[in-house]
Amino acid sequence: MSDLISQNLNMIFKTPKGETVHALKDVNFTLKKGELLTVLGPSGCGKTTLLNITAGFLRPTSGAIALNGNEIDGPGVERGMVFQQGALFEWLTVAENVDFGLRMKKEDPVKTAKKVEEWLNIVGLQGFGNTPTYQLSGGMQQRVALARCLINDPDLILMDEPLGALDALTREKMQSLVLKIWKETGKTIILITHSVEEALLLGERLYVMAPRPGRIHKEYNLPFASMGIDGDLREIKKTPNFVSTREEILTMIWNMEEEIMGKDI
């Protein structure tokens, strides 16, 4: 069964001035179980709106999106979200953040503690369970956010620019971690990013979205995510295929931005 299906998805907003904004128009796609999709595009192309509809935070104006045959009409435990900022409870310890969802469901404490230890090992935070979250760096906090999401075993992981606030070196390490988690869990993942390089490195599939109205402009099927699981991300970025695809997409988005600026003048 296909994991996620979007059919004729439309989202229309009204501005305070009464103007109509077509944030998404007739968005159609099918994402199969276990695929990693990255979504890229200029500001205003609707990529975050698409993610919020998939998360159940927004209801579309028309059309529908369904996970495993069930139409999404609100948040659900089968979907996990990782935000640009960790959205952690900074007054709690690392372990208390990670097991928060399981504690709310009143799961067995012994089994929960074991799961916490397993996920902290996977995300590279072994030994940090009792550390107050506010003492962690930005990169470490995002590792906590990943563990907190994954410990609940969602079918679909939604990531809204999760690495955007990190420095270059930490971001590279986290990109490798995302690929490692994808390989080890087989989870379906949608990751929103503003970085062309990141979209190419992490996306088994990549959608470039265009604005006004927000829509899928072009789809790419890419080899780089599979290469990056066991390979060197820096070396992958030097390959002719990566370089040429990056330049093609950069030019595409540049032209979109120029068109938007022209309309706004």
From Swiss-Prot:
Domain ABC transporter positions: 7-236
**Gene3D superfamilies registered for this protein in UniProt:** P-loop containing nucleotide triphosphate hydrolases
Kindly give the SUPFAM superfamilies that the UniProt entry links to this protein. P-loop containing nucleoside triphosphate hydrolases (SSF52540)
List the InterPro entries: AAA+_ATPase (IPR003593), ABC_transporter-like_ATP-bd (IPR003439), ABC_transporter-like_CS (IPR017871), ABC_transporter_ATP-bind (IPR050166), P-loop_NTPase (IPR027417)
Q: Which UniProt keywords apply?
A: ATP-binding, Cell inner membrane, Cell membrane, Membrane, Nucleotide-binding, Translocase, Transport
The EC number(s) this enzyme carries = 7.6.2.7
Q: How does it sit in the membrane?
A: Peripheral membrane protein
Q: What does this protein do?
A: Part of the ABC transporter complex TauABC involved in taurine import. Responsible for energy coupling to the transport system.
Subunit structure as annotated in this protein's UniProt entry: The complex is composed of two ATP-binding proteins (TauB), two transmembrane proteins (TauC) and a solute-binding protein (TauA).
Q: PANTHER family, from UniProt?
A: TAURINE IMPORT ATP-BINDING PROTEIN TAUB, TAURINE IMPORT ATP-BINDING PROTEIN-RELATED
In Swiss-Prot or TrEMBL terms, this protein is called: Taurine import ATP-binding protein TauB
Q: What organism does the UniProt record list as the source?
A: Pelagibacter ubique (strain HTCC1062)
Gene behind the chain: tauB
